Every structure is written in structure tokens, then in C-alpha cells.
Amino acid sequence: MQPFRLHRGVVAPIDRENVDTDAIIPKQFLKSIKRSGFGVNLFDEWRYLDHGEPGQDPASRRPNPDFVLNQPRYRGASVLLARRNFGCGSSREHAPWAIDQYGFRALIAPSFADIFFNNCFKNGLLPIVLPEAQVARLFDEVAAFPGYELTIDLERQVVVKPDGDELAFDVEPFRRHCLLGGLDDIGLTLRHADKIRAYEAERLLRKPWLANTLAS
């Protein structure tokens, strides 16, 4: 998992409340057994004028020119600005996969759905909760200034605006530690690889019959 320490990026606004996971990545794209390739279908039903199916070439489809991510001013955006209760609905981990694979590194909203919030951290995304008034102000500034960028400093836990104004946010210490170190669940487990190997060796000494069981 890619570490997250300091990130600066263009902000793309999704100006809707209660954006659910089916809007983030529609259900027909959940059939894939792979964990990659979801970014091209992020916000698929808003992003395209035609109905999409798994494996379809995005170049053959009709983009919706009015949707935020199709507008030139938001090209290359890596910070997603949203309204309250973002990520509600069914608990599909494909939603943060799609957001990450599109190229977003952080999300800012007044609130997130709990399961989606947890899944973001597990997949290297930083969901930032700010007061609603601050989020509303950011929406105004993004609309007023094309190419609007924010700098997100996870070590200091601040969002830095173009004018230097800083917005403080909180991240639970263990989650902050994992993001700073680029540690997902597998990475955390591998940090104890020596202890795991030592335990397995000691267990086989005590219970040698397990060797045949494990080999089969």
C-alpha cells in the first residue's frame, strides 16, 4: 500500500448528499474476480450517457460533458470533495477500490458512512471529516477558482488551502500510523513474519504429525 504523508492535488467536487456505493461503482461491475480495473467505471452512471457493462472499452462510450470528472478543469484531480453521508448504502469494498484506481488519494466531507470510512483506510485512502461550514466554503472556492488545489499534511493533520489557511482534522492514531507507513492488513501481519515462522517451527517440534497434514 502506498504511504500517505503529504499530498497536493486538484480538487473535484461531487455536490450531492448521500452518495451511495451503487452510484460510486454500479453493481454490474462487481462481477469481476479481479481487484483491478474499477477506476474507469467510477461514478459510471453519472459519468457516461450510455449504460456500461464489464469489459466494455471506455473509448467506445459517450461521456456526459456535464459531469464533474469529464470537465477539463478537474482533469487529474486527486482530492474528492463531497457532501454529508458519502459512501452510504451496501458495504462493497469495490467503492474505495474504484476511487483509488481513478487516482484519488483523499476525500473530504462533513461525514462518511461508517463501513465505507473504514474501507478507505484499509485501501490507502484518507477520508477527512471537516465541519459542514468549512466544507461548504471549500465548495465555493473550488467553483470560483479553476485548478483549485489543496495540500494535505497527514503528519500535522491539516489541510492547507492555496492562501495558506489551515484546516485541522483528526485521524485515529493507529490508522494514521498505518497510512504514514503504507501498511495494510497484510503489511501489518508481515511485520511479525519472524515471530510467525518461529511459532510455526516450535509448533512442529511439539506436534510433528502436523507436517504431513500441512503438506497435504
UniProtKB/Swiss-Prot annotation:
Pathway(s) per entry: Amino-acid biosynthesis; L-leucine biosynthesis; L-leucine from 3-methyl-2-oxobutanoate: step 2/4
Cellular component, GO, one term: 3-isopropylmalate dehydratase complex
Keyword Cell division annotated: no
One Pfam family linked to the record: Aconitase_C
SUPFAM superfamilies, per the entry: LeuD/IlvD-like
Annotated GO MF terms: 3-isopropylmalate dehydratase activity
EC number from the UniProt entry: 4.2.1.33
Catalytic activity: (2R,3S)-3-isopropylmalate = (2S)-2-isopropylmalate
GO biological process: L-leucine biosynthetic process
InterPro entries: 3-IsopropMal_deHydase_ssu, Aconitase/3IPM_dehydase_swvl, AconitaseA/IPMdHydase_ssu_swvl, IPMI_Swivel, LeuD
Alphabetized UniProt keyword annotations: Amino-acid biosynthesis, Branched-chain amino acid biosynthesis, Leucine biosynthesis, Lyase
Family, similarity comment: Belongs to the LeuD family. LeuD type 1 subfamily.
Assembly with partners or alone: Heterodimer of LeuC and LeuD.
PANTHER family the UniProt entry points to: 3-ISOPROPYLMALATE DEHYDRATASE SMALL SUBUNIT, 3-ISOPROPYLMALATE DEHYDRATASE SMALL SUBUNIT 2-RELATED-RELATED
Function description: Catalyzes the isomerization between 2-isopropylmalate and 3-isopropylmalate, via the formation of 2-isopropylmaleate.
Protein name: 3-isopropylmalate dehydratase small subunit
Gene designation per UniProt: leuD
